[in-house]
């Protein structure tokens, strides 16, 4: 699901402090929004914010020093024509950056068309970076997943599995080993670009971990600030299964890395069977370390297969 709504008023309030901008014209259009169809087609936030460009309609148009110079250079008729064309682009809002003064014709046409016009002294490049980062998260594809999401050895890891397998207890042990909690039970996942998923905790569950028999634990209060994280990028899913399920549904040594599709992105997946006496926390950390090696191009299984083939070839040559 991708949200499609944000008003000019909400955008203005969101950055009132960081951009210190003013609302110069179009005050009556505080509810003006992005075109929902444009949002659904956008490949990234770069499609939603950029410098003034007449071939990219329906996006936030940023007017820096060069753009204002272009609009005001030439005869009065040329300037009026260039400014009038901006309205035909139907931007959700205009932003004057670089401390530029608004040309009178621009103020007039924005007021007539009820087109929100903001002005800031910040650089146009900074404004674009800030708005793109915000909109990429606001309009990101999103879903929720049941599990415990953690920072393990610097990697965002989702621990999943059926109820009763001890996911929260495992999370607690991993926290006691110096890892960090992002979210327990319900994890909000956002696709913030073409190949990145970010996981966050719902506000209601922030810093909380539920352990059966004990109840809710405030991890931040018990273990300190360093035991919790606001967000992490999802890089690995560790799925816990019972022994009978593991033997029935999974290979002991898979020949190819497992993945799970999350919001259209394949995420590495590791299966760990839960059996009495196994130290699952150590196994999870080992799986994370192995995944880090794989991301660096070191594949232990492939190395073993190559070594095995080499040994077989040597054996044949000896015969």
From Swiss-Prot:
It comes from the Bacteria. Residues 273-278 are annotated as: Important for the catalytic mechanism of dephosphorylation. One of its GO terms (biological process) is regulation of carbohydrate metabolic process. Mg(2+) binds at residues 168, 210. GO terms for molecular function: ATP binding; magnesium ion binding; phosphorelay sensor kinase activity; protein serine/threonine kinase activity; protein serine/threonine/tyrosine kinase activity. Its cofactor is Mg(2+). Keywords: ATP-binding, Kinase, Magnesium, Metal-binding, Multifunctional enzyme, Nucleotide-binding, Serine/threonine-protein kinase, Transferase. Pfam families: Hpr_kinase_C (PF07475), Hpr_kinase_N (PF02603). The keyword tRNA processing does not apply. ATP binds at residues 161-168. It catalyses: [HPr protein]-L-serine + ATP = [HPr protein]-O-phospho-L-serine + ADP + H(+); [HPr protein]-O-phospho-L-serine + phosphate + H(+) = [HPr protein]-L-serine + diphosphate. The active site is at residues 146, 167, 185, 252. Homohexamer. Catalyzes the ATP- as well as the pyrophosphate-dependent phosphorylation of a specific serine residue in HPr, a phosphocarrier protein of the phosphoenolpyruvate-dependent sugar phosphotransferase system (PTS). HprK/P also catalyzes the pyrophosphate-producing, inorganic phosphate-dependent dephosphorylation (phosphorolysis) of seryl-phosphorylated HPr (P-Ser-HPr). The Walker A ATP-binding motif also binds Pi and PPi. This is HPr kinase/phosphorylase. The gene is hprK.
